[in-house]
């Protein structure tokens, strides 16, 4: 794979993972606003399932060398912090 094509694939992989991260955040925002309380087992199940799925996608992209492990970790850490902030705002 040429360097130019590799760069395009890496950028696209990161964009897709960031889009998935945004979708998870929106899902949790909607769930918190309309459906459940943060202490609800359903909320925890959805959150755990979505975060696990994203972590597997990131791991796959890292193994394919489409993104660096540090980029994947930063993406997960950022989403976890955003979701923690949402949770804190709902429980206050």
Swiss-Prot record:
Instruction: Please give the name of this protein.
Output: UPF0358 protein Exig_1994
Q: State the species of origin.
A: Exiguobacterium sibiricum (strain DSM 17290 / CCUG 55495 / CIP 109462 / JCM 13490 / 255-15)
Check the record and name the SUPFAM superfamilies matching this protein.
EF2458-like
Give the similarity note.
Answer: Belongs to the UPF0358 family.
Please report a single Pfam family linked to this protein: DUF1507
């Amino acid at each position: 794979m040429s360097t130019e094509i590799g760069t395009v694939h890496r950028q696209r992989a990161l964009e897709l993972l960031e889009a998935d991260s945004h979708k998870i955040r929106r899902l949790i925002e909607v769930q918190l606003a309309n459906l459940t309380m943060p202490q609800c087992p359903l909320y925890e199940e959805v959150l755990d399932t979505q975060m696990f799925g994203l972590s597997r996608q990131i791991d796959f992209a890292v193994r394919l060398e489409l993104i660096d492990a540090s980029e994947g970790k930063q993406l997960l850490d950022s989403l976890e912090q955003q979701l923690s902030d949402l949770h804190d705002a709902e429980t206050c």
